Every structure is written in structure tokens, then in C-alpha cells.
């Protein structure tokens, strides 16, 4: 992909790391303060300048931009107004289809506009307009629920044990400081949830006077798309979901099953390739050995971030190793080689990937939105012991210190005790049942949202088509030309997409290093 790495975007979707608004930078505190505006009589779209990210996005040069103005909390009369950044990108075709496609990004909390180049390269605007809206609280919105405090902690955390007491103390302080700053600015943290998110998109369609449109969402955006389809089905022509997080089952313990499934599929694919099987004959055993060894005897070393720059101190322990694999850093094709090198005393690949976390785009990721959704929708009804139980089931024999933390969401339960938002599990953990055509896309190497969950979602969607792409990880479409063709075919013929290109696909060869 030009300029932007797919790994950077997928890491953002999985909360690993992710600024300015308009023509001038706005601090997190001033952006939050801008929320205090009179509530409009009805949601409306107000034209305005397009965001100007540090790395220019070519598609925004021709886009029609502005803000969607909506109530911060629709359940409270007389509340405040928030502004959500919107871009309408014209279709490449001279005679485009009348029904546009609206995009729902992952995260929650990832910079939606940063995904635009991947959407363009995937042909999302080839035959129809592409509409992008930053979900409430994201970068370029007013307010922006970024947490620079958490970004700075993440940069520091690479030099700490993944599950160490010091890491927990510093993270919880960052969460507390962010919450205090946002609430002092008047932000209603309880209003940043999937129900309100879905209502925002329903209001956007009406505000733009669009009779019917198509929906495409990945990762958390698939959760949002399914919720939107359930609560606001009017005006939806077709829905495509990629790397599915089913609303009815997405909880903090759920992540362990997805991690185990994705890793199992990577190792199984290696075993199916003679050269890989011969060079790396027992990867499950090797991974378990390395997790145990690093958790008992963590490595502390200096490493250069994979993106370049000065070396930084990193601690590589069992928890860090597992979470680097979940983040698909290194790439799936390199994981067997990286594990083999690690077992032979060469941790360079994993150390550089760990060091990459020291380079944070401070203020770009809306950790406030992440916490409001994770704490209100994913954490309730379960406990830290449930996370540990799920971890033990997924990876028997691994150290409890590794398994006690949900993948990529360490210390989330104590963080939720600080964040203190209402329990929304009952209203959010509901299966979507619909006859609207739905395309369900998954990748067999997805270590964040297991591919098998797609089947359960599809069962409740009577006109659904499920496609599983071999050898692809999280967020399938930008990584697979075949998936791009399937998606285009689906939007052209939602009830009869051409999925034939998937037949015969195989994972690319794994990296084989000399013995």
C-alpha cells in the first residue's frame, strides 16, 4: 500500500496505537470544551472545510466536507450538541450508482479519516460515492475524546513488563487523568456508546437526504453496522461486514478464543506447506515454550522501532510476546521464523515490533470512546476471573500472569472502575435478525476477531453471504484483491455476489530462514 502500512491501520483498529483539526491544531482540552453548544432543533449537516491531517489525503481534495450536528445524549432533553466530521468523496465513475456507501471504522476510537487511502485503494468509491464520518468522540470531532495521557503511557509501557504492577499503576493514573479532564470539560461519557453511534449514522442519512445507501464496516465497525441494521433498518440497501465482532457475544473474555483460533490457523497453514512444516515442525509447542520462558525470565534490551529512529529500552515478556502476535507484528508469514529465531537467542523481530509502540501519534486515538464502549458494553456481566478462565481454555498450560489480561486490553476491569459508565450489556448484546442482504467477510489468520464467528452471525441474516479468505488477517478487504472483487460484486448485486475468486486461494508461502 502506498505511504501507509496496512499493519499501522489494523493496529489502530485493535487499539494498539493511533493531529490537528481543520487548519489549526486543537488541544484535547479545548476540543472537549467545544462541545458546550446549544442543542439543535433537529440533527443537521453543516458544510465546512475538510480535515487536514499531517499526511495529506488526496481524496479529501475533491470531497464535500462538514459536520453532522447531533445531541450528545438523545435520552436527555436540553442537552448539548456535538459535531461529527463528515466527508463525502465523489465516485470515480462518470455515471455512478445512486446509492452511496457509508463506512464504519474499527476501534472503537481509531482515526476514521486515516482509513480513507485504504478504502480508495480497495475501490470503495469506484462506482458510488463514499461517505466517511468520524464516530462520536473521534479525531476531528467536537469534542474529541482523545487521551494523550494514555498515549504517553503506551509509549512508556514498552520498557515495562506487560502485566507488571508498575505498568498497571501508570495506566490507571493515565485513565484517571483523562477521565477527569474530559468530565471537567462537560463531556457526558455515558453518551459515547454504540446505540448513540448507530443513531448518528441514521441521522446522517436523513441530513444528507439520501433515500438508500449501503454500509461497510470492519472490526468494531461491524458491531456498529449490525447494531445500526437492527435499530435503524430503514434506508439500508445492503450491509458488508469485515472481521466481525458480533454484538451478542463481544465481551472481554471473548478475545481469548479469537486469539487462539487465529494462531491455530496460522500454525495449521504452516504445517500444510512442506517447506514450513520441515523447518518449523512443532509451532504450538515452540510458542508455549517461549511464552513460559519469557514470562519467567523477561528480556530487557535496546531495540530500534520497526519504523526507524533511535533505539529504546524494551521489555519482552510472555504477555508482550502474545500481544505482538495478536497485533500481527510481525506479519503472519514471518511469525514462525520470528519464533524460531527467538528460541535461538535472536529476539530482534519481536523486540523491534515492541519498540514500535514507543512511537505514538499523541492525541489521535480516542481512548475515551474505547473506554466508554469497553466498560459499558464489553466488561459487564463478567469479571477478571472470567478473563483468566477463558485464557486457560484457549492456551492450557500458559502462565496465569499472561492469561489474566484480555488480549490488547490489559487492566481493563480496574480501568472500568475508574471510567464509571452505566452497564449497557442488556441493550447491546442482542443478535441482529434481518432480511437485508449482508456480506460477511473474514480472514483465516485474524487473531483479533476469529473467522469462525462469521457463521453464527450469518445464521440470523436470511439473505447473507459468508466468505472466508485464506491467509488474511484482520481487516480483510484492503489486503485481498479477491475480497475487493467480492465486495464490489456484492454492492452491484447484493443477493447474488460473485465469490468464485475465493475458490482455490491459499496462504502465501511462509518465510523460511536458514537452519
Q: Where do the PLM segments sit?
A:
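Glycine-rich nucleophile elbow surrounding the catalytic serine of serine-hydrolase chemistry
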Residues: 111, 199, 217-229
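Conserved acidic catalytic loop of the alpha/beta-hydrolase fold
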Residues: 183-187, 195-212
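Alpha/beta-hydrolase fold active-site neighborhood
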Residues: 288-436, 479, 513
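Catalytic-loop region of hydrolases
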Residues: 2-13, 27-169, 206, 284-290, ...
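A catalytic-pocket lid/entrance helix-loop region that shapes and gates access to the active site
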Residues: 146-158, 225-290, 323-327, 333, ...
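Histidine-bearing beta->alpha loop at or near hydrolase active sites
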Residues: 470-476
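Conserved alpha/beta-hydrolase "acid-adjacent" motif
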Residues: 447-452
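Conserved alpha/beta-hydrolase fold motif
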Residues: 215-217, 239
